[in-house]
């Protein structure tokens, strides 16, 4: 069962990510909570996107709040990222950017 508090935090932070980096070049998946497309570049419309980032909610929220760095999480195997544009390090953390 999905925790409603974590669900809200994941959805709000992903919405802010999309606001900061509009587009459809990267698919960010935080199962089982949400998935979004963001980032400038070639638009994805069908099938598996060329650029995919997937991680659990705990890792995502740690990145959002600056409790973990992208490179560290990637090196620890907490992030599954494929594709040339599958890197959100320049956008994280989001803690000071999330709208109230």
Predicted features by range, described:
Residues 1-100:
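Feature captures hydrophobic
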